[in-house]
Amino acid sequence: MMWKNIAPDNILLVLIDFQEKLFPILKKSVVNLVKSNILLLIKMFKEINIPMIGTEHYVKGLGHTEKDVLKEWGDAPMTDKVIFNCCGDEKFLQNLEKYPRPVVVIAGLETHICVLQTVLDLLERDYQVVVLKDAVASSTKLKWENGIESMKETGAHILNTETLLFYLLKRADTKEFKYLVKLLKEQQDSVS
């Protein structure tokens, strides 16, 4: 399946390890961009009824998902894991199997570690994977670029958040599109 064949009824969001204790290794501007896009994704995916599952890496040491994201997350499944590859965690796999969707959209941290390992495993399991380039991050630009390049070379589709959302909505004459425009304006105002 080409990424252009995706639709709200065949995708699932996986949010990987967006935890505040990881933020000090990232540039503040990168954290703000990624957080803004993750919040946009969560709000829109809830609006158009796309299921979401998430992970938190080693909560005992790294704490929980960033508070604003966690508040918006609601009661979607969230797995505490210690394995870098999310697919190596049995509870994560159980959550993934609850939603039999062929396309997995990926956001979170860090691009070259947990995100990369998870994407490679999902591809081996015959999922189509869409990595949102502006909703993943690493401690350095080089590591981020390496992670993105590695995922693309192995078959993941690399998009940005806005491209994906507009593609899913298809048209401008819906309440969902009006909601997206409102969210994009709020996002732009918060960044300026």
Regions found by a protein language model. Give the residues of each.
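Short, flexible loop segments at the rims of nucleotide/cofactor-binding pockets, characterized by
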Residues: 30-31, 56, 81-84
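Active-site loop/turn elements of alpha/beta-hydrolase fold enzymes
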Residues: 18, 57, 134
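A short alpha/beta connector and helix-capping loop motif
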Residues: 9-11, 27-45, 49-53
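N-terminal nucleotide-binding beta1-loop-alpha1 segment
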Residues: 11-19
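Short, contiguous strand/loop micro-motifs
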Residues: 27-29, 53-54, 105-106, 134-135
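Short acidic, Gly/Ser-rich segments with clustered Asp/Glu that frequently serve as metal-coordination loops
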Residues: 20-25
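Short beta-strand segments at enzyme active-site cores
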Residues: 15, 52-57
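Active-site-adjacent betaalpha module
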Residues: 2-12, 48, 60-192
